[in-house]
Amino acid sequence: IPARESFTRYLQSYPNGAFSLNAHYYLSLIGKEQKDETGVLEHTGKLLEYPDSPYSEEALLMHGEILFNRKEYKQALADYKQLQARATTAERRQLGVTGVLRCGVLLKDDIEVIQAATALLAEAKLTPELQNEALYYRAKAYLNQKAVKKAADDLKLLAKDTRTLYGAE
């Protein structure tokens, strides 16, 4: 708590000070640790006002995660798309695309699902679970869009492994 108070005091005294981004970043980490979603949203929101800051990727991830968990999928989708576009590592890009995929599924946005799943399936290092999830949701989106042949291709790949939930279906 003393660190939190110190950073908060600093921001009250110097809202645009040289270390304000650092303070917002550390306050968002403290908020995450203490499960203070409102605090995390507040401080990551401030960080996102500076898209070129060294904290923007992590801020997008934390911000998007909370919005997703609060079922605010449209807003979370925007964060995940930004993360996908700006990520400096393959791992973070994959987290962004996975977020886009899951938001797309929950928003019933077939085009978003197809694009995200296709992007995920193009990733070099994809876990079998994530590959199956992407194939499954893309197949369902293709069916919704009446692209039966494309859906069948994805479903055939999934059916090879009936040990998984997706393959069994």
Model-derived segments and spans:
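Acidic, polar-rich low-complexity tracts and alpha-helical solenoid repeat scaffolds
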Residues: 1-169
